[in-house]
Amino acid sequence: MGKGKNHDRKANPGFGKVKSKSGTSTGEFTLKRVKGENFYRDAKSAARVKMLNGGKAVRDRDGKIVEAAAFQKGEKEAEPGRVKPDRRWFGNTRVISQSALDHFRTALKEQKADPYSVLLKRNKLPMGLLQDDTKDSGSRPHIVETEPFGDTFGPKAQRKRPRLDIGSIEELGESSAAAATAAEAATAESQANGTADLADIYHPTTSTAREPIYAKGTSRRIWGELYKVLDSSDVVIHVLDARDPLGTRCKPVVEYLRKEKAHKHLVYVLNKVDLVPTWVTSGPYAYAYANGPARWVKHLSLSAPTIAFHASINNSFGKGSLIQLLRQFSVLHSDKKQISVGFIGYPNTGKSSIINTLKKKKVCTVAPIPGETKVWQYITLMRRIYLIDCPGIVPVSAKDSDTDTVLKGVVRVENLATPAEHIPALLERVRPEYLERTYNLEHVEGGWHGEQGATVILTAIAKKSGKLLKGGEPDQEAAAKMVLNDWIRGKIPFFVAPPAKSEPGAPTAATAAAATTTEAEKKKTEAEEQELAEERETMEILEEQERSLGKVLGIKRVKGVEQPISKIVTMTKFIGDDARRYVEEEEVVDQDKEMVEKEEEEEEEEDEDEDEEEEELAWEDVFPEEADAVDGGEEVEESDKEETDDEEDVDEEEAVPSAKQLGKRKAIDSDEEEQTANKSKRMTTNKQKATNFYTHANVKNRNRDRKVPKNPGKRSRGDDETTGKKAKKRR
């Protein structure tokens, strides 16, 4: 039997060689294998299994630990050691004197009270010692120190029973009734003196069970979204409704930010300023009396920076000021790559609309109904500024009734079972003249009040709008829903007046305007002028200090935010004293008129320059000689018609001049006069061009700039082609 070619193993040394395990052969790159690692588990999963299973230490029969368990400190780590001798062990550590503590405490208190100071970093100081706890010192009752537990209860009690103010249910009822009467008397007195909080005027307390629909914005999910936004944002913008700023302010959230998140900056944005008169938002200082109404921007600026805003993608107000303020914050936080700005507030206050206005496009879904935003959303404004949209939140308050919740725009009106029950409270807040004008109702002496007045006005509105039930009965619930929707969307004029500077015995604005100025009033005005001068001096000194500090530190300084609030265009028309509740001085009025006239003239000049730029250049305007040559020959009649059309259009424009053109005819240059003279020489006929409705009407917005067509003498397409051919031939 012959042998095969592979039969001789000595001849083929590589035949039958067994593959060795990885890492056993010398000179081969090996990895350190973990105990337990095999085909089924890698090193990570093996370590995890070892952690889960190896929770016990290995001990001998005497109970001593032979092998410590995982995550268990052994005896070797706790061996006694020798401390290295050093003089620093006996020296002073970080110490501070009481005088320095008092100085830091007063400085910190002043900076905390200033809403425009920004906390960037906390130094290595004992902040617990620096914070002033005088307000909270008496908050905790020291019961144990006053009466120890052993002296009150137990075998060594010194009295038989605890001292209780109320011993029965009858005494509890009497005490609660007395407390209620005392609270009512206190609120009535505060309202009479004018010291009551405006947010408490329409907020009676209630103890009845509420329907689930009135608990919108208070769910655990929405408040979880709020805390996500607060934790993620460096700047928190609280959006308020200009019609009721204090009513739409989330006081618990503001207090939480002040106490727990002092390093986050709070800014108020007063949205929907186009729905209130300009004097409510703010106004020139010359119009404000010492006892006149304080504007909302000035009032809210005492607690935080406040900006008036009107959210609109095309016609907005306050957009530049808000972006400038956000850029200031980004400059302050120059050590960060970017800052996040969170928008919080009540539902339907315009948070998403403000973000769309800043982006100048629709990036957030918006609707005139509350609850459109469900979850938080990140939007990139620019490279270093991010915006965070938050769903609307409603802080739980015992002062808010169901009607207050509805009138603040928290609840969707179509989901209300009985919307007519909220109309009496609405009638108390709105003047009857506005309802008559909005719904075209007949004038009623004294207006509508109470449930009876609500029934009367709802019946009239239902009949006017055709909302009837079977048998021709007016549908009051449908009419109430319509009124509430108009209220929420701003069609019914309403606003809460800003707080006035109330002083005991001070005269009102009307009496002050009518009466002659006394010596006391003169002293008051002089004192106010001195205060204003001192404030200006201090502001100048602070600005100089900021400039010098910026030069030293090399920090880029950004200008302050200013707003021309007097230029806000109000959408709703208010009556008489609502439109302007301050008395204007004659000199101030004259100055304002001059300023307005100058601004109007500048705007007119800019508009005229834009119109001249927008006018299309014709061929004859650039090459008049060639145009005359082209117009000769076969196209004489057509050119004559075009010339007459041009002249007739000019005549029509001169016959019906606009207000801008009347004031500008004196400023026509001599070159323009020569051009018009040259054009008038070319007129050869008096034929009138036929006109119709579409000549002057603005159909499909094509003729929006002028009453006459923009270029009535423009050649047709065939004419352009012929002139083009002739021009080619000439060339």
Swiss-Prot record:
Cell location: Nucleus, Nucleolus
Top-rank taxon: Eukaryota
Region: Disordered, residue numbers: 1-27, 130-162, 517-541, 585-731
Keywords for the protein's UniProt record, in alphabetical order: GTP-binding, Nucleotide-binding, Nucleus, Ribosome biogenesis
Biased amino acid composition, Basic residues: 699-715
Xref: Gene3D superfamilies: 1.10.1580.10, P-loop containing nucleotide triphosphate hydrolases
Predominant location category: nucleus
Residues annotated to bind GTP: 345-352, 389-393
GO annotation, biological process: ribosome biogenesis
GO cellular component annotations of the record: nucleolus
Acidic residues bias: start-end ranges: 597-655
Biased segments, Basic and acidic residues type: 132-145, 519-541
Compositional bias segments (type: Polar residues): 685-698
GO-annotated molecular function: GTP binding
Pfam families referenced in this protein's UniProt entry, alphabetically: MMR_HSR1, NGP1NT
Positions of the CP-type G domain: 223-396
InterPro entries named in the record: G_CP_dom, GNL2_CP_dom, GTP-bd, GTP-bd_ortho_bundle_sf, NOG2_N_dom, P-loop_NTPase, TRAFAC_YlqF/YawG_RiboMat
Function: GTPase that associates with pre-60S ribosomal subunits in the nucleolus and is required for their nuclear export and maturation.
Family of this protein: Belongs to the TRAFAC class YlqF/YawG GTPase family. NOG2 subfamily.
Name the record gives this protein: Nucleolar GTP-binding protein 2
Organism: Cryptococcus gattii (Filobasidiella gattii)
Phylogenetic lineage: Eukaryota, Fungi, Dikarya, Basidiomycota, Agaricomycotina
